[in-house]
């Protein structure tokens, strides 16, 4: 798993991994998952 430059919560990474996506961070306190994180 490649590490992101910014630190993301492990819960976010784990919930996104279930969808086979990457955690891009939190949006309104909710995990924001995407295949590609922009910027």
From Swiss-Prot:
Residues 1-5 form a propeptide. One of its GO terms (cellular component) is extracellular region. The keyword Disulfide bond applies. Transmembrane segments: none annotated. Disulfide bonds join 12-24, 16-33, 23-37. The modification Tryptophan amide is found at residue 38. One of its GO terms (molecular function) is toxin activity. Expressed by the venom duct. Its main location: secreted. Keywords: Amidation, Cleavage on pair of basic residues, Disulfide bond, Knottin, Neurotoxin, Secreted, Toxin. The keyword Calcium does not apply. It is found in: Secreted. The presence of a 'disulfide through disulfide knot' structurally defines this protein as a knottin. Belongs to the conotoxin O3 superfamily. This is Conotoxin ArMSGL-013. The lineage of its organism: Eukaryota, Metazoa, Spiralia, Lophotrochozoa, Mollusca.
């Amino acid at each position: 798993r490649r590490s992101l430059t910014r630190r993301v919560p492990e819960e976010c990474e784990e919930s996104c991994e279930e969808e086979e996506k990457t955690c891009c961070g939190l949006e309104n306190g909710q995990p924001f998952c995407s295949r590609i994180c922009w910027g």
